[in-house]
Amino acid sequence: MSNFDFLKDEFIDLYELCLEAEKNCYIKPRTSAFYSRLALEFCVGLVYKFEKIQTSYNEMSLNDLINKKEFKDLFQDESQIAGLNLIRKFGNDAAHMLKNIISNADRNLSLNKDIALNCLKGIFDFTVWIAYCYGST
């Protein structure tokens, strides 16, 4: 049983990404943060699709998509966007270790279960919103 079972029927691909993030949260926090970011990308793509938000090829980074005015206007509170950006940043850290090693930054090496859990909570909240807004049930 998963906290994301509510996604199974209508958003199976999203469910599978979230399930990986959930399964790995305590045993492989880096993997969990990475899958939370992938789920975030999927969710943002769904919002753009369902809301028919236009974007150009030059605006295709996740950062650009999250911070685009038409996307941000869908949310009541700026803290919701800040939460999505944290998932994006920690997911980036999980995936891109080389830059941080070369620059001697320690933040990439400190991805722990607390960070993974915060990412997971954030993606859970976003997927509940996705299911509520765009699901049929």
List where the protein language model places each region:
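A ubiquitous short alpha-helical element
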Residues: 1-7, 72-80, 108
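Charged alpha-helical initiation segments
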Residues: 1-30
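Amphipathic, well-ordered alpha-helical segments in soluble domains
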Residues: 13, 17, 35-38, 42, ...
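Short, charged/polar, low-complexity loop and linker segments
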Residues: 16-20, 61-73, 96-104
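Hydrophobic alpha-helical packing segments in soluble, helical-rich domains
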Residues: 29-54
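Charge-enriched, short contiguous segments at helix-coil
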Residues: 33, 78-136
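Conserved NTP-handling cores and scaffolds of large molecular machines
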Residues: 43, 47-51, 69, 73, ...
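Short, charged amphipathic alpha-helical segments flanked by flexible coils
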Residues: 48-89
